[in-house]
Amino acid sequence: MIDPRLPLTDIHRHLDGNIRAQTILDLGQQFNLNLPANELDTLRPHVQITKTEPDLVSFLQKLDWGVAVLGSLDACRRVAYENVEDAAHAGLHYAELRFSPFYMAMKHQLPITGVVEAVIDGIASGCRDFNIDIRLIGILSRTFGEQACLQELDSLLAHREGITALDLAGDELGFPGSLFRRHFNRARDAGLRITVHAGEAAGPESIWQAIRELGAERIGHGVKAVEDRKLMDYLAEHKIGIESCLTSNIQTSTVVSLATHPLATFLRHGIVASINTDDPAVQGIEIAHEYLVAAPAAGLTPHEIRQAQANGLEMAFISEQEKQALRDKVFPIS
């Protein structure tokens, strides 16, 4: 269930993993690209998960058509705006949208800084039109290597006022967090908050690395934390939140089934964990599905689902005053 008295949040939601199939079709035609299909129904299997993928990298390949059609900065602005519209229509009161400017720029060699500007502009327009609070998290795409990530970081820091936090995502096994220490040192020095994808494809050592070497305040996915009791204790004691993405973890074969997902274990251990989507358009789900279908299937009680909902706001990269303003907006006390 979703408690209507609490703000509904999604703090692990990829902007470049939530490009509508119709938009892919529209932009593909606009830029005269050879798409795998020219009709919406036949395009969907190429851009949306239809079966469990064998691993994370295979899952991520489903995102490629979404960014392949970004032939201009206006296209980037459009998908950013549509992401805000989708979040509002999903019933969210607050979301943190993360994006990799290098990944979005790569196919058509767009200026990376221009992509950051376009995304910030599209988000700002969407927030005005749809009355929702959205913050942006910049992603360093580890898959493209250290130099590409430096370019991303430079572009994100050039627009520091529009970026709330920094994330590291991509091929966790091939590109460990230790390669990106200097990137995250710079980000922290600039005042960015830190979240890191870890413990999804790699083991608990990747989570320790994210915390100790990159300064992670939150962990994306983090399912492998359950394999290390000391790590579980540390996460609970230091209130390092886990951004859980239930359906995604099944689709990437990170977890065998919802029944074996560790989210309930995290909550019962006192870890601040929340419920999120990940890549809604690619997954074919929205936040309501995660609360109403996935969370009960993962063994969460109604009380634990409510706790996870409250945790989403507690974990948010905004001030306590902003959190209280959201609470008051959703459930004003006369």
From Swiss-Prot:
Catalytic activity line of the entry: adenosine + H2O + H(+) = inosine + NH4(+); 2'-deoxyadenosine + H2O + H(+) = 2'-deoxyinosine + NH4(+)
Keyword Transport carried by entry: no
InterPro entries assigned to the protein according to its UniProt record, in alphabetical order: A/AMP_deam_AS, A_deaminase, A_deaminase_dom, Ado/ade_deaminase, Metal_Hydrolase
Alphabetical GO biological process terms: adenosine catabolic process; hypoxanthine salvage; inosine biosynthetic process; nucleotide metabolic process; purine ribonucleoside monophosphate biosynthetic process
Cofactors required: Zn(2+)
Ligand binding (substrate): 14, 16, 170, 279
Residue positions of the active site: 200
Gene Ontology CC terms: cytosol
Keyword annotations of the record: Hydrolase, Metal-binding, Nucleotide metabolism, Zinc
Record-listed E.C. numbers: 3.5.4.4
HAMAP family: A_deaminase
Family to which the UniProt record says this protein belongs: Belongs to the metallo-dependent hydrolases superfamily. Adenosine and AMP deaminases family. Adenosine deaminase subfamily.
Cross-referenced NCBIfam families: aden_deam (TIGR01430), PRK09358.1-1 (NF006846)
Protein name: Adenosine deaminase
Protein species of origin: Yersinia pseudotuberculosis serotype O:1b (strain IP 31758)
